[in-house]
Amino acid sequence: MTSMASIANRQNSYWLSWEKGYLEACEAFGYDTNVQTNNGEVQTQQQQFDSAVSNDADFIVGQTYTNAAAITLAETLVEAGTPGVLAVTIADWYVPQDAGGEYVTFFTPHFVNHAYSAAKMLFEAMGGSGTFVHIEGNRGTAPNIGRNKGVDLALEEYPDIEMAGSRQPGNFIRSDARDVMNDKVSQYGDDIDGFFGQNDAVALGGITVLEENDIDVPVVGIDASEPGLAAVAEDRMTGTVSGMGPWQAGWSVAKCHDFLNGHTLSDAEKMMSFNAPVCVKNPDEWTDTIDRLPVVDAADYNDAIFSGETPYDWKKMSVVESGEDAWDPQIDMQPMNLDDMKTVLDWKEEDKPNGYSLPGAYTDSAAQEETTQLYADRFQSNPLE
């Protein structure tokens, strides 16, 4: 039995940790592995999918680099009869059912909750007042839009906090974040009281400029990358929210394994979101402030994810392997209804294609409640706590 995983690169710890989860899960379920890097190039990723299906891969897992690419990649899976999971990025007004059964499921971090929690942590660390810099990521992408919404939501609760001018894009990379922070420091200087980085790379890029200018302020990021966790340990960052790379990959493998062995997800399970932990140096200081996400020790998280094998029981994620009453996602997951899609993925009613209608499960409150309860009941163990 063979598989293929599609990742952007091996240059950052998020993708390295994602690859680690994929390799571990495939070993647990007995699949040969094949990791392909696409460097964020849609055409390269499409060629890799085409090659995998022509070589009779049993399943494909990964993330699409652009929203629109999700459609053509999903169609490739369905036309070949090859099951797959495409996570995190999906086209507007498009769900797995629009492609076909082989698009096993879509899931994504709850970008809004993650950024809201990180922003609350930052604003509390700032003492509830002052001016902060917010450097965003790639404009127009769901992670960036959702995280902006989360920060704005937190701002509503802190009337004495203000943003240092408008957000500027750091494109999720250090060098661009440095350029933006240089501009912000020249404009605001010592009036900067905090910094929100749209991911750890942005946070770390901005920190270097702040440090060069002797500006010592609270900083938060998102991803819980190795460099980000190191910055938390060194008190250069207050905290970082995990991207859960290994879990994302392993969950994808488990769902494809279930599909290949006759278990299909309900309609409401086809679009899911998850909540990841906030990684800090002293969790007890933050458990009362952070109410939407779990709070974990950054050093313990670093050991669990990046040192040796990850703590997940991959077979436990499989309904086929563990049984209907014993499987466990090992993370907090919820189905996405239409409102969630609009909030987290930034779907707008005016962009809906003429004549398009979502499958009923996404607006059926009973189906949503049943699925929410199912995943709450099955979430029995959190290996990171």
Language-model features and meaning:
Residues 1-385:
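A residue-level marker of the well-folded mature domains of exported/periplasmic proteins
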